[in-house]
Amino acid sequence: MANRIKKGDQVVINTGKDKGKQGEVVRVEGDRVIVSNANVIKRHTKPNPQAGVAGGVVEREASIHISNVNIVNPATGKGERVGFKVLEDGRKLRVFRSSGEALDA
């Protein structure tokens, strides 16, 4: 099954502590996505001079399950569900389910 959400998509978070936040998808890892400036966690790291890493508390984005985000429709500004439409030449095209307009050109 092809992913409905890809890197670079603008998404809105549906559930959790960051509900309602919008951001860009930085990375897709299977059924999880990493959204910029959302689900930020703190990790305590040890210094590693060989790798050039200074120790301390580092903030970074944690992954969110793909079912907890929706793609933002530029026309409405709201998060909407996405489906697929198969073209005559066999290509799959992502479309918004509410309006049927194409997400990819």
From Swiss-Prot:
Superkingdom of this protein's organism: Bacteria
GO biological process terms on file: translation
UniProt entry tagged with the keyword RNA-binding: yes
Pfam families: KOW, ribosomal_L24
A Gene Ontology molecular function term of the record: rRNA binding
Gene Ontology CC terms, in alphabetical order: ribonucleoprotein complex; ribosome
Record keywords, A-Z: Ribonucleoprotein, Ribosomal protein, RNA-binding, rRNA-binding
SMART domains the UniProt entry points to: KOW (SM00739)
Quaternary structure and interacting proteins, as annotated: Part of the 50S ribosomal subunit.
Name by which UniProt lists this protein: Large ribosomal subunit protein uL24
Encoding gene per record: rplX
